[in-house]
């Protein structure tokens, strides 16, 4: 399925859940093949952009750019996720698949084949395209591909509305390029975030929309992030397309989750680790003060600690770590650290238990182990390790 392989994997994962063969499934795609050979192969097709930009559905679109990525989704049956208090980002209501069949060339898409996959997704979902507010398209930025994709979408969507465009269309490839085997997963993750954050995401690098969108009865190109206003009579709905190089087509129907808010998991450890990084001590003070003045409920304390790990930069010049039992303990230790910075004793006076800080640039570690991935050895491998 090539570029549609991650949504092909998703279809198999959904079958596993529906059949009861699995209770939790991880599905997605991985691509890290942007070596010179990959570019040489793609350069033999009209797919690559000579200007080095991917501009889906734009008048000046001239091709795609290759990207790399990993996209993995955790899937469960809704009843199981609600029972276990899992955080639910969105619902998958349907998925449709199919093939273009015979065409003029292996990389030439057929709108009719894509339309079949789209229609199958909505039949499975149990609702029509007129209730969909956002389509995260395959949108490679190639003239032929974008034109064919919009033609396929119009075959399904046109005549379902009141004649005025109601559905936003876009592509994450304008931001990250074409991640090939991971492309479908990237598009799906973007659409899921759009639903959970109630925001219509932008497609960037658009000067003037393509001609096929100017007179569209169904679609408009969203070029800036804005609140997602939806009808009160139904939840927000989005769809995702992913089309393969050889004609494999997949379309996923997503829906906003409107059920009860997931219960935060209980704290496992008596203390939590908070980590901070900045380029200057003033920057560190600003970060610490922000945390001191943030009211954190007991059930959210672990989540706040985890969020600091996501923004921590290990190679920053100024780094600090605090181990705290609760918000009061965290505020006291952060205040002690701020006090030392402001009095000029930072780095010389003892900080006390549970507080660690450094202004020394981190050193590059030595090689300790070597994992070849194949179990193979080479001459002098042990000597290389000994000298490292």
What are the functions of these language-model segments?
Residues 109-124, 213, 233-367, 378-384:
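Flexible catalytic loop/linker elements that gate and position reactive groups at enzyme active sites
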Residues 1-268, 286:
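Condensing-enzyme catalytic core of the thiolase-fold
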Residues 386-388:
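Short amphipathic alpha-helix adjacent to the substrate-entry channel of hydrolases
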